[in-house]
Amino acid sequence: MKLSNIPQRYVIVFLTFLSTCVCYIERVGFSIAYTVAADAAGINQSSKGTILSTFFVGYACSQVPGGWAAQKIGGRKVLLLSFVLWSSTCFLVPLDPNRVGLLVVARLLVGVAQGFIFPSIHTVLAQWVPPHERSRLVSITTSGMYLGAALGMWLLPALVELRGPESVFLAEALAGVIWSLLWIRYATDPPRSEHPKAAAAGFGGALLPTNVNHHKVTHIPWKKIMLSLPVWAIVVNNFTFHYALYVLMNWLPTYFELGLQISLQGMDSSKMVPYLNMFVFSIVGGFIADYLITKRILSVTRTRKFLNTVGFLIASAALMVLPMFRTENGVILCSSVALGFLALGRAGFAVNHMDIAPRYAGIVMGVSNTAGTLAGIIGVDLTGKLLEASKLVYSDLSHPESWRVVFFIPGLLCIFSSVVFLLFSTGERIFD
């Protein structure tokens, strides 16, 4: 089948799916490559935590500006610029754990560049995706994150073993360039004739205007957005989701290496299972949400609350029992359940900003993702400090108690966040 025969909105969804996939290959890849290089150089866990968390400082700084830029310039252009910037940085900067200053600057630049990605994607999707396909198409796009993480965990340790840690940077830069060329070739802004007739089919309002400079969208209701309890319900859950995700993504390699004394290079494809599980559960969650809504089984509000609550509470239980398991299979099982149900919960909070503010989807996503990025800064850096403190008590990190508080913190946050979402979220449009 020719690409021209496929509805353009599905082409856009596929390309944005690939973009999130490539981004998370980069994030997992840096964690794997840097862990190997830093351990070989004798870098301590606290310093590792600082370097790993530096990305999130830049990422946090560019979330809201990314939403603003996508709103004013257009998500398609901003997304391309982001890919060009982070790919160039990966290509040009050498991986040397002893050159701390250079690594800090490089990770800040990559973080700033990637911070524009998700606000841009959601601005593009808000223009292309009709309400009755919203949950599943947005979930398909974001599921690329987890497939990327799974592929990174599967392929990149072998690449490190064969070619060294530096080769990971070059592979990631190449992937970014290839995606950019595909985006230039196939991505377009939606003409009115391309819009699916969602409203006529009885599934809600029309899509956004295609002209981002239209006079009706020049005024952004910042005060109303920042004082909205439903927005804060999304923000709190985004913080918790990313705290759990980034702690596992950045420290699970160390947990296997030092906590269980298992080499990542020696593990089989099981190390990709937690992220592959996220990929599957994310898509399943989107289809369940759309089914419940379009079949009128539950309202949009109840659907979002139901999936968010189920996902976060089961993930909480899995996170808190994870350090009790001392085998490779046990840890793979617990981390798979935790990450899988967190991904299911994204059919609640992570699509909700398009329910309540479709016109300002990129802006609300930027605000929400800022909180998620702060979670990365806090969680990744705090974990390094907690592990250094544990070494003073237990002498090394192979003792299970060294890791208990690391996984209890995101577990408790999941419970708190699910309660906040139950109390304050809504599926109704509250911003014109």
Swiss-Prot record:
CDD domains assigned to the protein according to its UniProt record, in alphabetical order: MFS_SLC17A9_like
Span of the signal peptide: 1-23
Localisation per UniProt entry: Golgi apparatus membrane
Residues annotated as transmembrane: 50-70, 78-98, 101-121, 140-160, 164-184, 229-249, 273-293, 305-325, 331-351, 360-380, 405-425
GO cellular component: Golgi apparatus; Golgi membrane
UniProt KW keywords: Golgi apparatus, Membrane, Signal, Transmembrane, Transmembrane helix
Keyword rRNA processing attached: no
Family: Belongs to the major facilitator superfamily. Sodium/anion cotransporter (TC 2.A.1.14) family.
Protein's recorded name: Probable anion transporter 5
UniProt gene name: ANTR5
